[in-house]
């Protein structure tokens, strides 16, 4: 609403993202929550370390971390998600002077940095709802720059990947419900629309 403070607006956005994170966790298990938490931790730590104006509590860094995490695959090593949050806040936001001064979206800049640096990891998408819920969906706890180990996980093509390479469409119901491979935030289109309407 008009006249709302910046922190109120930011934390309202965080609240609107919570159902999407919860649904990603339902589909991809604890890996989803770990990846979002690591990206958010990287963003918050960087905001706290580099910005001395007490902006950590306004919620903008938390939004950056959560949005970044939702653009990542569930099986991503947590250290990659963390440095994505560091890059997004440090280079995408604070270098330009902080909130409202940035030229690029910090979350997407962090995603672009990770995509350029670790293209294979960023395009390996575990299939949703495969195996026991509590099983990690990838190599979340891999050491930085260690050789990837063989993973007992099922991967799948994203809807766009299926269309491009297999010339197959994705059933509309799968897109609505979120039972497709992809990034954590590519879950249920219906839930995403409902969360967006909450902000309208």
Which residues fall in each region the model found?
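Structural signature of hydrophobic alpha-helical transmembrane segments
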Residues: 27-41, 75-84, 180-189
């Amino acid at each position: 609403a008009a006249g709302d403070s910046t922190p109120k607006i930011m934390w309202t956005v965080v609240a609107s993202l919570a159902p999407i994170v919860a649904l990603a966790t339902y589909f991809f298990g604890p890996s989803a929550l770990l990846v979002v938490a690591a990206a958010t931790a990287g963003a918050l730590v960087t905001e706290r370390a580099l910005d001395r104006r007490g902006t950590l509590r306004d919620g903008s860094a938390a939004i950056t971390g959560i949005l970044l995490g939702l653009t990542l695959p569930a099986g991503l090593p947590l250290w990659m998600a963390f440095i994505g949050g560091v890059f997004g806040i440090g280079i995408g936001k604070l270098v330009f002077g902080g909130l409202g001064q940035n030229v690029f979206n910090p979350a997407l800049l962090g995603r672009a940095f990770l995509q350029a640096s670790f293209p294979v990891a960023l395009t390996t998408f575990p299939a949703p709802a495969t195996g026991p819920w509590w099983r990690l969906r990838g190599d979340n706890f891999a050491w930085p720059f260690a050789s990837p180990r063989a993973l007992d996980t099922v991967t799948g093509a994203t809807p766009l990947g299926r269309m491009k390479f297999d010339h197959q469409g994705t059933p509309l119901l799968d897109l609505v419900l979120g039972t497709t491979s992809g990034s954590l935030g590519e879950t249920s289109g219906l839930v995403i629309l409902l969360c967006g309407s909450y902000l309208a």
